[in-house]
């Protein structure tokens, strides 16, 4: 192989490596909160979180969100779907007159330091049995 051809191969490999690196970083840094903000219309915002309007059933919308980014935990209770991500709790369900609302709450808003006892069934482990009142959090000890 000639010297110029080797430079061309090396350059091509460098470009391919850079594209792979950027693609990998992009895929690893998916953020469900940003996805929701860019795909759904914001209905309201308060100190505890942001609400977005959605169409379809809560289960369908939650499944769409799970396809974008897999949550650490998923549970449902009646018509509401709960998705726990590394930094957010996402709740999808009816709210007031709205048949489908997505609520995004940052974990630092209170979940991390025990401000909320019940996050819907299926979120385990529950709070310690020696905690307030001596009973595990949530029904069946799930938190």
Curated annotation (Swiss-Prot):
Sequence intervals crossing the membrane: 114-134
Membrane topology: Single-pass membrane protein
InterPro entries, A to Z: DUF4247
Superkingdom of the organism of origin: Bacteria
Major location (coarse): membrane
Localization in the cell: Membrane
Keyword Signal found: yes
Cellular component, GO annotation: extracellular region; membrane
Xref: Pfam families: DUF4247
Keywords, comma-separated and alphabetical: Membrane, Signal, Transmembrane, Transmembrane helix
Residues annotated as signal peptide: 1-16
Protein's UniProt name: Uncharacterized protein Rv2599
Organism encoding this protein: Mycobacterium tuberculosis (strain ATCC 25618 / H37Rv)
